[in-house]
A protein has these predicted regions:
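ABC-family P-loop ATPase nucleotide-binding domain
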Residues: 1-22, 295-347
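Short, membrane-interfacial amphipathic segments enriched in basic
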Residues: 9-25, 76-88, 126, 204, ...
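N-terminal signal-anchor/first transmembrane alpha helix
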Residues: 14-62, 137, 215-218, 280-281, ...
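Hydrophobic alpha-helical transmembrane segments of membrane transport/permease proteins
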Residues: 41, 49-83, 242-248, 303
Length: 360
């Protein structure tokens, strides 16, 4: 154990147990919200479509049946969502399209977080000229229309799902950079960060141990909401013909195919449009549920700590007469606070007691 490591093993075990209890409380709050449960179940269904779509699909999504009885068919026992103008099963195409939707979200979201989080940490932690230069670039990109910039980048990289999602991921990284920077700016002024600096921890260790754990709860909410944005932007790009190929089972491409049949068979756009709407709604419902659950836990944490400290002070035995006679200095229930601005006073010492006897 280093000279600066003052955490007792029992404290570590207690902190770990408290962390597990906190996660359990968050999950219980999530599962008590029926809208959040619906969002989680829908996303779980999409993950099944991503991993093994053949388990859910009952037809080949690209097989055409040009017999007159199979063209533009409404939902039936054999074709649950009907068929399109080429006799392809719409239900199977929606299921396999879910695989492309999750793939698009993973590509764009992975790139956005890989760029945005480190850039935001660097900007918020260093400050000064580096912060101003980074945020100038971020603000410029943030102010421009996302679809137009994505079209420009796709024009340079080429059409296709992967180039389109690379463009979307680069542009959406500004959202994560701004969010991470805001948390880093607030956390770097905390007393425990100053203590970590004094103890000799490196910048990387401080960011990993103290800053990132406070960033993740906010990022989880943002990730859920941004996932819906990625799906919408990807569908628009595929609808315009610069994402997935026009004849693919991508949901945006299916909308474009239905647009061509909107007069002869308007129902064709319904399955893919419903899949997009429900998926975006599910991600937003999960994001709202996580935000409410985490916010409730964060608000309750200081109150629980205060209650525990108050119980500890009440349970602390009063100094005996022997201690009072022998001690040159006796202190009980010492509390030290500093003004904390809008957040209230910052308590750095709480309920400390000690005695100094002759010769000590």
């Amino acid at each position: 154990m280093s000279a600066f490591d003052t955490t007792a093993p029992s404290d570590t075990v207690t902190a770990a147990a408290g962390s597990k209890r906190g996660r359990g409380r968050i999950w219980r709050r999530l599962l008590r919200n029926p809208l959040t449960v619906f969002g989680l179940l829908w996303i779980a269904l999409l993950l099944v479509c991503f991993v093994a779509p053949w388990l859910l699909a009952n037809h080949d999504p690209v097989r055409q049946d040009v017999s007159l009885t199979r063209l533009r068919e409404l939902p039936s026992g054999e074709h649950w969502l009907g068929t399109d103008a080429y006799g392809r099963d719409l239900y199977s195409r929606v299921v396999w399209g879910g695989r492309l939707a999750i793939k698009a979200i993973l590509i764009a979201l992975g790139l956005a977080t890989a760029i945005g989080i480190p850039v935001g940490l660097l900007s918020g932690w260093r400050g000064g000229r580096i912060d101003r230069a980074i945020m100038w670039v971020v603000d410029v990109l943030f102010s421009l229309p996302l679809i137009l910039l994505a079209l420009a980048i796709v024009g340079a990289l080429g059409t296709g799902l992967v180039p389109a999602m690379i463009a979307v991921g680069v542009l959406l990284s500004t959202r994560f950079a701004r969010l991470t920077r805001g948390v880093a700016l607030a956390e770097r002024e905390e007393l425990y960060v100053d203590a970590a600096r004094i103890s000799g921890l490196s910048t990387a260790a401080i960011l990993r141990r103290y800053i990132l754990p406070n960033v993740w709860p906010v990022l989880i909410v943002q990730i859920s909401i941004i996932s819906g944005v990625i799906l919408l932007v990807g569908a628009v790009l595929s609808f315009l013909g610069v994402g997935s190929p026009p004849d693919s089972y991508d949901w945006g491409a299916m909308l474009n195919q239905g647009r061509e049949q909107v007069l002869a068979f308007p129902y064709q756009v319904v399955p893919s449009a419903a899949a997009i709407v429900l998926t975006v709604l599910a991600f937003n419902l999960v994001g709202d549920g996580v935000r409410d659950a985490i916010g409730h836990s964060s608000a309750a944490a200081p109150r629980r700590r205060g209650e525990r400290a108050e119980r500890a002070r009440r349970a602390e035995p009063a100094p005996t007469g022997e201690h009072a006679e022998d001690a040159l200095l006796s202190v009980r229930g010492l509390t030290v606070e500093f003004p904390g601005g809008d957040r209230g006073p910052a308590r750095v010492v709480d309920g400390v007691g000690f005695a100094v006897r002759r010769g000590e």
